[in-house]
Amino acid sequence: MKYELQKTDGRARRGRLVFERGVVETPAFMPVGTYGTVKGMTPEEVKETGAQILLGNTFHLWLRPGQEIMKLHGDLHDFMQWHGPILTDSGGFQVFSLGAMRKIKEEGVTFQNPINGDKVFLSPEKSMEIQYDLGSDIVMIFDECTPYPADWDYAKRSMEMSLRWAKRSRDRFDELNNKNALFGIIQGGVYEDLRDVSVKGLVDIGFDGYAVGGLAVGEPKEDMHRILEHVCPQIPADKPRYLMGVGKPEDLVEGVRRGIDMFDCVMPTRNARNGHLFVTDGVVKIRNAKHKSDTATLDEHCDCYTCRNYSRAYLHHLDRCNEILGARLNTIHNLRYYQRLMASLRQAIEEGKLESFVEYFYGRIGKPVPPLSPQLTD
């Protein structure tokens, strides 16, 4: 993988990630294909929304169908028939979200398989081996996702263990002679001093890109913005920056303003299945009765298959009847909305008009523009 930085506007960056399997224009949003599928969508449909890279879930694919089934097909690309780049998370977040079902030690994490109750062990080394078999174009290190709230002492211990695990991940990745990219994950909770230690430690080890982890876990938005403003300038400018698990359209805009290049989130797909649709003017809850006889398109600014062909009334009808097609059409639209938003952000950075676009974006959804810290507006 090669990262090319093409243009900046304030802290925002316009670039591209070049892989053997294709080019990803950044800032980029990655749809989530947890079990080797973006729910309800064929790979061709996902590609038509404008997506250039997907996220797969190491934890879930390891438990089912397992490494052996994956290897029978070649790798995850062949298994799911997506031939563009794939980033896989390390399984860390899923393991730590199991709560009482898991036990953390220096060696790794022992937990109860949520599918069949078996006792399972996942370590940095094992995560690297699974992701190697998946053929991931971007491999994520195995880390502990520090929960929120966490006091300074807990966040420090967690971050320090994540650093040790980062080194073990790097070592096993290199032993496997994996020629793909490996990203480090910056931890440290909402504490700037701990984030500083994490960034320095990861940069000293050396990675192909750097993710900001442990955000979007319940902390106030102001804390997320503060940490991003503090951390992003410390990440080497020639490496991509990835904000994990984020998020709402506003979060993508704010991440880009602060220097983030890559995002992923289940929100567009999960919300689509619940009839919660993102449009230029905010959100449409398609189940609401006011859409029953609305012949208008969902979003007049959108060029997706759904908006080109169907009315709000039809989407409302499908939702009320719990028809599978409704969930599919909603998903097509939400994914296209996210990709159009990213394309607009890229264009605005290219033209040096990012803040003008930000004002337009918030004006359409009827919200004030969140302030940048003074050093970002100098």
From Swiss-Prot:
GO biological process: queuosine biosynthetic process; tRNA wobble guanine modification; tRNA-guanine transglycosylation
Entry's cofactor comment: Binds 1 zinc ion per subunit.
Binding site for substrate: 89-93, 143, 187, 214
Keywords: Glycosyltransferase, Metal-binding, Queuosine biosynthesis, Transferase, tRNA processing, Zinc
Gene3D superfamilies: Queuine tRNA-ribosyltransferase-like (3.20.20.105)
Pathway annotation from the record: tRNA modification; tRNA-queuosine biosynthesis
GO cellular component assignments: cytosol
Catalyzed reaction equations: 7-aminomethyl-7-carbaguanine + guanosine(34) in tRNA = 7-aminomethyl-7-carbaguanosine(34) in tRNA + guanine
Keyword Zinc among UniProt keywords: yes
Cofactor: Zn(2+)
Sequence positions that bind Zn(2+): 302, 304, 307, 333
UniProt-annotated stretches for the region RNA binding: 245-251, 269-273
EC number: 2.4.2.29
A single MF term (Gene Ontology): tRNA-guanosine(34) queuine transglycosylase activity
Residues annotated as the enzyme's active site: 89, 264
Record's function text: Catalyzes the base-exchange of a guanine (G) residue with the queuine precursor 7-aminomethyl-7-deazaguanine (PreQ1) at position 34 (anticodon wobble position) in tRNAs with GU(N) anticodons (tRNA-Asp, -Asn, -His and -Tyr). Catalysis occurs through a double-displacement mechanism. The nucleophile active site attacks the C1' of nucleotide 34 to detach the guanine base from the RNA, forming a covalent enzyme-RNA intermediate. The proton acceptor active site deprotonates the incoming PreQ1, allowing a nucleophilic attack on the C1' of the ribose to form the product.
PANTHER family xrefs: QUEUINE TRNA-RIBOSYLTRANSFERASE
Quaternary structure and partners: Homodimer. Within each dimer, one monomer is responsible for RNA recognition and catalysis, while the other monomer binds to the replacement base PreQ1.
Family indicated by similarity: Belongs to the queuine tRNA-ribosyltransferase family.
Protein's UniProt name: Queuine tRNA-ribosyltransferase
Encoding gene, per UniProt annotation: tgt
